[in-house]
Amino acid sequence: MAIISEIIQGTKIINEIQSTNIKKTEYDTETKKLVVEFSNGFKYEYDNVPHQLYTQFRMSESQGKFFSTNISKTFKYKKI
């Protein structure tokens, strides 16, 4: 998996990801909210994700595996 593109808009970092399950992420450095858009079109917002953890997620060899292990069941989330 790899980051296809990255856009920074104010406090938001938007990444399009080449992954089987994850299509796109949006991270707000101010609110620490992470929005993940999956390949099936569903979007979820995760609260209070530390910036350092988001950076590790972006740089990981397998974002899908990192997400499943360190984010998906660790942080409060809602479907949006």
Where are these regions (language model features)?
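Acidic/histidine-enriched, beta-strand-rich ligand/metal-binding domains
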Residues: 1-80
